């Protein structure tokens, strides 16, 4: 029965069902998720830290690769630039 259904479709359908169930519970006045302000602040701090680490690491790595001749292609480019007197 489910052989022809994409895994992504199944995941999206399950998430939709959870979201709809949560909305029904909210409309009935039932708290589906008990979350306090401290939990939200902790989550925010964790996400901020993770984002800054990923951002700093990726931009640093990209800048380092971009500005240095460390790959095989980069080394060939450096040789060509030196040969044409275009290297600083």
From Swiss-Prot:
Its main location: host cell. Keywords: Host membrane, Membrane, Transmembrane, Transmembrane helix. The chain crosses the membrane at residues 15-35, 45-65. It is a multi-pass membrane protein. GO terms for cellular component: host cell membrane; membrane. Pfam families: Holin_SPP1. It is found in: Host membrane. It comes from the Viruses. Belongs to the SPP1 holin family. May be involved in the secretion of the autolysin blyA. This is Protein bhlB. It comes from Bacillus phage SPbeta (Bacillus phage SPBc2). The gene is bhlB.
């Amino acid at each position: 029965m489910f052989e022809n259904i994409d895994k992504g479709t199944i995941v999206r359908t399950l998430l939709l069902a959870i979201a709809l169930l949560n909305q029904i519970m909210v409309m009935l006045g039932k708290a589906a998720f008990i979350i306090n302000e401290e939990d939200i602040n902790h989550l925010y701090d964790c996400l901020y830290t993770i984002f800054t680490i990923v951002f700093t690491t990726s931009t640093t790595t990209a800048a380092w690769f971009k500005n240095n001749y460390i790959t095989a292609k980069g080394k060939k480019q450096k040789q060509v630039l030196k040969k044409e007197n275009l290297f600083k």
